[in-house]
Amino acid sequence: MTMFNWQQKGWPRATCNRAALRDELAAFKVAFMELKKALKKPQDMEVVARALTDEAVKTSAIEGVNVDESVVMSSICKALGVEYAPKGFTKDARAEGVAQMMLAVREKWNAPLTAKLLTGFHGALMAGEEKRVAVGAFRTHKEPIRVIRRHADGTAEIRYEAPPSENVPKEIAAFARMWKAPATTPADVALKCAMIHPHFESIHPFEDGNGRVGRALVAKTLAEGLDMPLVLPVSTVIARHRAAYYEEINEASRSLDWTNWAAFFIPVLTEMMTSFVAAMRFVKAKRDYLAKYESGFSERARKVVLRMFEDGEEGAKGVLSAAKWMRMAKVSKPTAIGDLQTLEKLGAIVRVGDGIRLEYGLSGFTVEPINEPLNGELDERLLKLAKTHPGVQLSYMKSVVGKSLATVKRAIAALVKSGLIEHRGSKKTGGYYVKEVR
């Protein structure tokens, strides 16, 4: 019979092989320090509101709960004093609840970890759900809490069974004692984030909402490490790796060695921080551009340019043609050409390319580049394998480098993106090669 981690000798003290995580911790440190440097400037409340909203929406989506993003954003912006004009208005109690939890996490970012803090987060999250679950209170029912996977053939598999409800107060007391001390170095922050999450999920102290509260604790741990009230959108990246996230956390629930889990989760945090710094720099570049040119825009031009910014950096760096302007502004071709010529005279757009079609780009729009964290020795070993074993497959790479599949996949993806290696052949039988320079 499978023994879950809380049933094993040594619980609740899980272990993590720090030496085996050298590459992951090094990459985390680069991203963490880059983020800390970016945050030395006054916080842009638009970025803060966007991060809180993204985290609220994605942490809900991971659990299969869809919330209205505009309701979340409106609630958060109102609390932060940020201007926001929602496209419509709907009532969504779950959206309001998760928004209030995010605001509570931001407010209590450096508060001591206590049972009261946890039940407070849960109370905000589940407000209005009193008929369904115990809100703001740990579970007390005698029935076991189980995570069950149902298969296509109708059979069911118990993936996890949490400690009995009667054990929860004792488990939470031990949890709070273990994690009350703040992490002081980037490596300690990474490891605390990686360890606190499966520990909390293994206790599963609430009837519902454990995943959302658990991910909020990761955001709180990062805020403590950064020493500022900032809730980072951890769940936006977890959502991209949702299947692997559930698989890895399920493995952690059956063992007290959480090295493989940490090897998966720390790069997720690294990816999130890198994306967040990019978002901060994009907002600054957008603000700088609009401050320089917006006063000369017509209302129509303003709407089109802002629409380009809605698609992020990729949208802002896209090209404008008369045909595209016609679609976006819903005007005739002569009007579109006239609008573009006016913006060109203003200096807001410049001609790009040398093709037959006349195309423009936003003038001087640049986003400060990011120092992408690398995996150091791991990158070198994977590159060497692709060179000495042309067509090498992922499974062989994993066995040679001795890292988790998630870590190897992420490193390979970065090498492919950088143009150093490429995949050839089918998904099942193809392999990786050093990319030829043409």
Regions found by a protein language model. Name each.
Residues 1-438:
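FIC/Doc superfamily catalytic core
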